[in-house]
Structure formats: structure tokens, C-alpha cells
Amino acid sequence: MAYTYLITGATSDVGRTLIERLLHNAPADTLVLAQGCGDLAKMAELCRRYPGQLRTYDVDLSDRAKVDAFVEVLAADAPAPTHFIHLPALPVVNTKFKAFDQRRFDLDLEIEVHSAVRIRKAVLPA
């Protein structure tokens, strides 16, 4: 059985390490659909090492319309994912609770939770 992994936040250190481990010695029909946001250059070495097994997508998960467009592209151009790994997050900013940033919190919630729900609804079987 061919595995297709959909990995959001794939350009993170964790995402790239996971992709390396998944594709190292994997069957040739293994495919990773890797989402990043403005930083796909980080995937260049993996794309070179695993030609045909890694497709990259530059998608801003904080924008619901872009998330919806992304799942439409996946539905049209990629096999249905057998696995979904959701890793995106804003960079950590340590701050005192007194300096809590509601706007940043809402943005992170959109990226980490709302996008996951929208993508899962689109790619997981009913």
C-alpha cells in the first residue's frame, strides 16, 4: 500500500526531520505533501534527495480562504492522504502574562486549531 503523508508546518525543524525519517529507505511510491509558509527554500535539500516523493505547498494557514484553496488543490492534484501530521505554529515568544497579546493568540489559534479542523474535514474520509 502506498502511503501519502500530508504534513503541515513541514518546514519546521521537526517537520524536516520527520520527512527525512519517513522517506529514508521508504518505497518509491511513498509521497509527502509538505506545507510551509514563505519558507519553502528550507525544503530544497530534501526535494533534491527525494525527487518525486516530496511536493511542497506555500500556504498561509492563518487565512481561511487560503486554507480552503489549499484543500481544493490537494483534492484535484494529489492522492488522498493516508496520514495527516499537523505541526504549524508561530515562533515561541516568551512573555509575562501581563503583556498577553490577544491578537497573536488569536492568530496562533487560527494556525494551530482552525486550519487543522478545515483541512481534516476536507481530507479525512466521512
Task: Annotate each PLM feature.
Residues 23-43:
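Conserved glycine-rich Rossmann-like NAD(P)H-binding loop of the short-chain dehydrogenase/reductase
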Residues 8, 81-89, 112:
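Rossmann-fold scaffold of SDR-type NAD(P)-dependent oxidoreductases
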Residues 47-65:
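Rossmann-fold cofactor-recognition segment
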Residues 19-20, 76, 111-126:
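Amphipathic alpha-helical dimer-interface segment in Rossmann-like NAD(P)H-dependent oxidoreductases
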Residues 62, 100, 107-115:
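Glycine-rich NAD(P)-binding loop of the Rossmann-fold in SDR/ketoreductase-type enzymes
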Residues 11, 15-20:
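N-terminal Rossmann NAD(P)H-binding glycine-rich loop of SDR-like oxidoreductase domains
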Residues 62-77:
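Conserved Rossmann-fold cofactor-binding substructure of NAD(P)-dependent oxidoreductases
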Residues 89-106:
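Conserved mid-core segment of classical short-chain dehydrogenase/reductases
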